């Protein structure tokens, strides 16, 4: 009886803490907090403060610096440089597979885009149309297709790589909120990924269109791409770029870096119908490493 009461009490306390956490997410000035975090993360002086921030982060989150190209944390010019650190050569060999994991992290969800909806968590869904900023034509390209949502934890390698070779056809920056992205918010915030600020990147590949959606979150100091650098559009206004009309194309090979998160978040992959089959070992919570096999062409 005591154990039952303890379980009920623990579950009740957890529920209260989760409710308070979500309430905090709604009342805190999300963008101001993220800008302040970005300011601190870019500080180069005083060096003792920069080094202390990095050292405490490594200790708290258990970052494996043996994989880094530069393992001495004091040699990073600022926290952002440390957070987006490169890996040593050979740390992430590319698998001989059709489709590679684009990032270190964990599978949040993956599966079919059924009736235009992507599964979020515990009975919560969001539409591909909403995720892509209301673009009906783009969303139709992925109707009945497959999606994979990968969450990058603070300790992870935070550069994103191409799961397949592709030519960039367009991008769309979509302004939004900056809820934290984790299990608690996924289970309690409706349409989380379709509400947060995000950058949608569209590619033409050998099997058809593919979308990579880089989702921002609270205290994420920024998103960068290899073709345009930091994404810094006017606030509260969507910005679309058609790369097919530009004089020089952006073509990336499978495994090439395509972008990075300043303090991390989530990447969502969208594939068309009857094109992709994910490896059976992947499911919600499965850890991923950039470059390992994610799936194959159907």
Residue ranges and their predicted role:
Residues 5-298:
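Contiguous, well-folded functional domains in the mature portion of proteins
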């Amino acid at each position: 009886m005591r154990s039952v009461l303890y379980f009920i009490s623990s579950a009740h306390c957890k529920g209260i803490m989760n409710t308070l956490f979500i309430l905090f997410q709604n009342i805190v000035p999300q963008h101001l907090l993220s800008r302040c975090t970005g300011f601190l993360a870019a500080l180069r002086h005083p060096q003792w403060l920069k080094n202390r921030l990095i050292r405490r982060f490594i200790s708290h989150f258990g970052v494996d610096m043996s994989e880094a190209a530069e393992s001495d944390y004091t040699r990073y010019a600022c926290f952002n440089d440390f957070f987006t650190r490169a890996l040593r050569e050979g740390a992430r060999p590319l698998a001989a597979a059709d489709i590679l994991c684009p990032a270190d992290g964990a599978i949040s969800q993956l599966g079919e885009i059924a009736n235009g909806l992507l599964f979020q968590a515990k009975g919560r869904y969001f539409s591909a149309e909403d995720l892509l900023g209301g673009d009906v034509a783009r969303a139709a390209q992925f109707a009945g297709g497959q999606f994979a949502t990968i969450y990058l934890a603070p300790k992870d390698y935070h550069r994103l790589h191409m799961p397949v070779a592709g030519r960039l056809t367009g991008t769309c920056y979509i302004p939004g909120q900056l809820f934290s992205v984790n299990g608690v918010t996924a289970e309690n915030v409706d349409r989380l990924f379709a509400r947060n600020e995000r950058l949608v990147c569209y590619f033409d590949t050998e099997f058809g269109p593919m979308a990579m959606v880089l989702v921002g979150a609270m205290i994420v100091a920024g998103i960068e791409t290899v073709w345009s650098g930091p994404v810094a559009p006017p606030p509260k206004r969507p910005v679309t770029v058609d790369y097919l009309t530009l004089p020089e194309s952006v073509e990336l090979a499978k495994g090439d870096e395509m972008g990075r998160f300043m303090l991390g978040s989530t990447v969502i992959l969208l594939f068309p119908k009857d094109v992709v089959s994910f490896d059976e070992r992947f499911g919600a919570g499965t850890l991923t490493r950039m470059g390992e096999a994610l799936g194959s062409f159907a």
